[in-house]
Amino acid sequence: ARVQALKPTDAIDASYRRDLLEAFEDSGATLPAAQRERVKAIREELDKIGLAFQKRVNEDGTTVAMSVADLKGLPASWLKDRQRDAQGHVRVGLDYPSYIPFMQNAVSEDARHRLWLAAQNQGGVENIERLDRAVALRREMAAIYGVPDFASFTLKRRMAGTPANVQEFLARVRGAVEAGEKREMTELRADKAKMLGKPVEQVKLERWDVAFHQERIQRERYQIDQEGLRAYFPTEASVAYALRVAQQLYGIEFVPAKVATWHDDVRYYDVFDLKDGQRGDFLGGVYLDLFPRDGKYNHAAAFGVAPASKLTGQRPTSALVTNFNRQGLNHEELE
């Protein structure tokens, strides 16, 4: 009521007032008490499901046993220090530095297929059950708000507006890229046929073939070897260079500092404004968590750790989480 009573003085105030009122409405503040409590319970359960889902993926230690024949095509730098089981097989995990190079370089289609299947099933049946439960909860919440589905509820405050608009946009994108996609898939299929010595008509391009034949074509046509590039971009030197570029580009300075971290691999920097070569105001802090390990988030992302506050003068802190190869970076990782 207090927000509704406010009279905006300009367009910015009006927009902010509208956003606040819509946020209250979406939180369930205008619903009858029983429905409001149910929405609260649904949101809490969805949060728990999301955390449990990601935790299960992070802690999934699935590995696939690969024989010497399965490893044909993998560079020596990748094979170095790989763990082997009692039968002498290399255990290949699903972390990025293991999975991506394997899918790009392993000559054996069967080996790529087995690793791809393991990746598709990461998290197991438990996570499928969690997804089913999340879908049901979202459907229930949409019904409480009187909209046909959760997509409609999510999009109503966003630029797209409706699921129909999203589908129309995706159809336009599909129309723009479809011809190019068909050309590329035809090219990859032809490369597979060439490698197998079979007519193209007898060859089917599978999902686990795509990265391998893309890499093969790059090597043959452009002499680009993603794994070979790692020797030219050592990880530590590349990270240090990226920080220097950021310093020059944004007029800031990264200063290493010793603080408590959640793992020995994690490093922390204070970030300062830099004026005329002189260190200025403290702007915030950033953690770098660069390398894979068991139980860690297995993608790349930037997370907020602590927000800024004008009231207390607190500066923001964030964390950059990646899963880089310790031996060096390829072109995609360097980007």
Which ranges hold each PLM region?
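Short conserved micro-motifs at the rims of enzyme active sites and ligand-binding pockets
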Residues: 103-105, 297-299, 330-334
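A conserved hydrophobic secondary-structure block that centers on an alpha-helix together
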Residues: 28-42, 121-153, 164
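Structured ligand/cofactor/substrate-binding pocket environments in proteins
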Residues: 123-130, 239, 331-335
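Short, charge-rich amphipathic alpha-helices with coiled-coil/heptad character
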Residues: 103-119
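Extended, charged alpha-helical coiled-coil/arm scaffolds that mediate oligomerization and mechanical coupling
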Residues: 11-53, 57
